Amino acid sequence: MDTLTAIGRWLAKQHVVTWCVHHEGELWCANAFYLFDAQNVALYLLTDDKTRHAQMSGACAPVAGTVNGQPKTVARIRGVQFKGEIRRLEGQESDAARKAYLRRFPVARVLPAPVWEIRLDEIKFTDNTLGFGKKLHWLRDSRAQQA
């Protein structure tokens, strides 16, 4: 199994992302339920335009964040650190992403918030189930690497 496939399988089983944005010297983090898109290597989420993080992001912004589980033992720790770009989707892109998102999270039908995409450009996946401190690295526009 290649690195991106391994990372993608794990991301598809999780559902909460933490992401951070920077604007005019200020940092802010937020959490949301997400849907992983393996084809585009992206996360889709809903967040209102009035939130602090959306205001700081504008239509598009650099982003960094994490996805992690909550294991009870160190040997089972798995998690992703990433950097990429967050952007607010519009039109058909938004409609298609919302439809897929609502299949996974039907309760979100009551939320009128816009759909955002976090395009993952760099991923570091720590997976202690493969050995303590095992890291898998992936870069967009580059071959997967292992460290």
UniProtKB/Swiss-Prot annotation:
InterPro entries: Split_barrel_FMN-bd, UPF0306. Gene3D superfamilies: Electron Transport, Fmn-binding Protein, Chain A (2.30.110.10). It comes from the Bacteria. NCBIfam families: PRK03467.1. HAMAP family: UPF0306 (MF_00764). Belongs to the UPF0306 family. This is UPF0306 protein YhbP. The lineage of its organism: Bacteria, Pseudomonadati, Pseudomonadota, Gammaproteobacteria, Enterobacterales.
